[in-house]
Amino acid sequence: MGSQPQNFNHPYSPYDIQLQFMRALYTCLEEGKVAVFESPTGTGKSLSLICGSMTWLREHKRKALQDTVNKASCSAGDDDGEPEWMLEFAKRESARAVTEKRRALEARLEKIKVEEEKQRHAHATDHPGEARKRQRLDTSSGDPGQEQDDQFILDDYDSDAEERITYSKKLGDISGLSTSTLELLERFKEQFSASAEDETGHEDDDVKIFYCSRTHSQLSQFSSELRRVKMPSSMPAELSTSDANTDDAEERVKHLTLGSRKNLCINPKVMSLGNATAINERCLELQQPGVAAEKRCPYLPSKEDEGQVLQFRDHTLATIKDIEDMGKLGKRMGICPYYASRSVLKHSEIVTLPYPLLLQRSARDALDLSIKNHVVIIDEAHNLMDAICNIHSVTITLSQLQTALSQLTTYARKHKARLKGKNRSYIAQIIRLISSIADHLRSTIGENLPAEGAVDPSDLMAGKGVDQINPYKLSRYLQESKLARKVDGYVEFSKDKNQQSDDKPSSPVLFLVQSFLLPLMNPSAEGRFFYLKFHDDIQLKYMLLDPTNHFREIVEDARAVILAGGTMSPMSDYRNHLFSYIAPSRLDTFSYGHVIPPENLIAHTLVNGVLGSEFDFTYDSRDSEKMILDLGRTVAMLCQAIPDGVVAFFPSYDYLSRILAIWRKPLVGEKGQTILSLIERKKSILYEGRDMGAKTEDLLQEYTRTIDSGQGALLLSVVGGKLSEGINFSDKLGRGVLIIGLPFPNIRSAVWQAKIQYVEQKTYNSSSGSEKDRLSIAKAAGKDFYENACMRAVNQCIGRAIRHRNDYAAIVMIDRRYEKANIQGKLPAWIKQSMLRRSVRRPASALAADLSNFFSGRSSG
């Protein structure tokens, strides 16, 4: 590989660890690797990702363009040995053609950028939220009484047809659009490709960067960082045909943010449905065959809107836009940004999108999104494995099954005379299958069984006549017949007709049931079924236990895959599970230090309390009242040594409640004092409750106000709760972080027993040696997987503090198990380095003295 850039076009003077990060990233992209990057929050990770990847991309494009021009000149020289001047002329002409296309595009985009700036100022006091009026009627469900019953009748269905190749297969999973709409989208795709090819010179296989994060909020922050960056042109200097006054080096970053219909829909009546599934289905309903033109969505691009879609494309590329900007642009232009954004995709360099749109095959197909030979970067990837499993898991309750059964039975009875052979047969099969599942759940409620447990799928399908069902054919019928859409549409129509509608949109229950039936009839070796009893209902869940195969198709398609996060440790899960099939030479892991100087962090374990109790928060010992009281006195002492804000993380809400109950009790011989009152002498106490939801923000504001008032505050939080992820406790909000115990998942739960059993079995099957050795290796793999789940949660809590170069904090891990080498080995590198400097075990009083010395003389801010 050639030499790398010096500073990777970083907008500031990069720190040494940022340079290390960008160099490693550049190399991984160039060599087509899969890599895991850990860089603590506050180290400028986002800019490092942007600058490292975009610098590589522009250099890659420059080389590709040079090769294209060279090949063109070689082709010209193939005819009877053309003279040198002719070859040079061909080379210049090829370069000129590309240069002119790029220059024309940049000029158009610059003009749009200036226009948008003017519009922003002009419309500051206007009505920017209003959609531009289209020359079509606004969509509406109309007067329900005028709806024709025909729209709810299923099309004839032939499950034995050999070929069912439709436009929806070509365009992805967007079944339900009318044939004309599908043809239109296909035609647009071809026309946009052709016209844009002429305008920009982009090729279909131009490498792109797909940047993925968990939420649109995180993606918006990334977009803000992207606006800071200016990249050199991908045009080789020797190919430039411009004069001295023309700056060919000006080439803006071409960015597109993708979102779901729920994020991008601009149709008020569809948006008002609120529920994502309902929005998706109503959108498709408005495009179905037979829907009158005036009833269709007026914002869906039509053939006459081709020019407008191209304008939308250019407006999108002119400036960096987040998801809100895309919605506003669609409203201003009166065109659906969800569909119009497809015209932008091909011409983008960097595409941002949330987890579900990348990680779900059906979502990628719906967007016509190919990642073949492109770069995939997944940020905030510490929970990637869980996210993949959750996306491909489905939960349903007995009450929802009963509702779906009632709706389906009513629909079948109402349209009995008009349902022909195959439709009638399959609907009867679905009713039998749902009844079988519901019967099993009802019997589970009645039996003296644990609150949760595993379910054998054969038990769910043991009902009368279910054994005669062909799972493959019924699965295909559910996916292709649009039954759920027809039934849910009929239910809504009936409610409106009978004036039973309310303002609250209903969730399409049959779609949920359908999504559950598909894995039930096509069981995966990586999935399991579980039940959970609660209140007067029972929940049934299909859970994906292993994300490997679902992510594998992304890894095998992409040129390179990068996982990045502030706390990616422990790393072994990626090597042993998610990427177990990858050759070691293709997989790299990197863990970088912090930008703070070493003296700004003190990290320590604490084994004994001020009264001498050994802190052992294992399941068998954690309820010791003596230990919990000693913990309270120790926390009080630590709060005296640590200024401003301290955040303490407990293993669970239940255990925090147990501790608070003991801390509220009057202490013997201390005149009514409690542990809480002892702590409150030092700091005000606030705590995170279960299911706080929107109240979390109020809690944080109160915590901040208390600290700003000079009182100091202790915030009692829970690992895995709202405050343990995504919340920044920078500066005086997080001068101290206390981790009480280790938050191991409940090993007795059916889910975790299944997970560990799966890991052990998979490891056993892939290992070699004697039976004893294979069993030992399998047990060790299960133990490691279980510990990693715990330590990943711990590391997330630790990462809440130290958010920038000048920040400083103390981190205290309270439990004897934190002394173990295998546990410390799973901590982030920057924490381990701090602990090595203070490797001697310290009693609580000595640690408090160390903390006092650490904070003395430091100015709070």
Curated annotation (Swiss-Prot):
Reactions catalysed, as given in the entry: Couples ATP hydrolysis with the unwinding of duplex DNA at the replication fork by translocating in the 5'-3' direction. This creates two antiparallel DNA single strands (ssDNA). The leading ssDNA polymer is the template for DNA polymerase III holoenzyme which synthesizes a continuous strand; ATP + H2O = ADP + phosphate + H(+)
Sites where the protein binds [4Fe-4S] cluster: 265, 283, 297, 336
GO biological process: establishment of sister chromatid cohesion; interstrand cross-link repair; mitotic G1 DNA damage checkpoint signaling; mitotic sister chromatid cohesion
EC number(s) from the headed UniProt entry: 5.6.2.3
Cofactor note: Binds 1 [4Fe-4S] cluster.
Alphabetical list of SUPFAM superfamilies matching this protein: P-loop containing nucleoside triphosphate hydrolases (SSF52540)
Domain annotation Helicase ATP-binding: ranges: 4-431
Keyword set includes Isomerase: yes
Keywords assigned by UniProt, alphabetized: ATP-binding, Cell cycle, DNA-binding, Helicase, Hydrolase, Iron, Iron-sulfur, Isomerase, Metal-binding, Nucleotide-binding, Nucleus
Motif (DEAH box): 379-382
Cellular-component GO terms for this entry: chromatin; nucleus
InterPro entries: ATP-dep_Helicase_C, DinG/Rad3-like, DNA/RNA_helicase_DEAH_CS, Helic_SF1/SF2_ATP-bd_DinG/Rad3, Helicase-like_DEXD_c2, P-loop_NTPase, RAD3-like_helicase_DEAD, Rad3/Chl1-like
Physiological role: ATP-dependent DNA helicase important for chromosome transmission and normal cell cycle progression in G(2)/M. May have a role in changing DNA topology to allow the loading of proteins involved in maintaining sister chromatid cohesion in the vicinity of the centromeres. Has a specific role in chromosome segregation during meiosis II.
Stated family: Belongs to the DEAD box helicase family. DEAH subfamily. DDX11/CHL1 sub-subfamily.
Protein name per UniProt: ATP-dependent DNA helicase chl1
Organism of this sequence: Neosartorya fischeri (strain ATCC 1020 / DSM 3700 / CBS 544.65 / FGSC A1164 / JCM 1740 / NRRL 181 / WB 181)
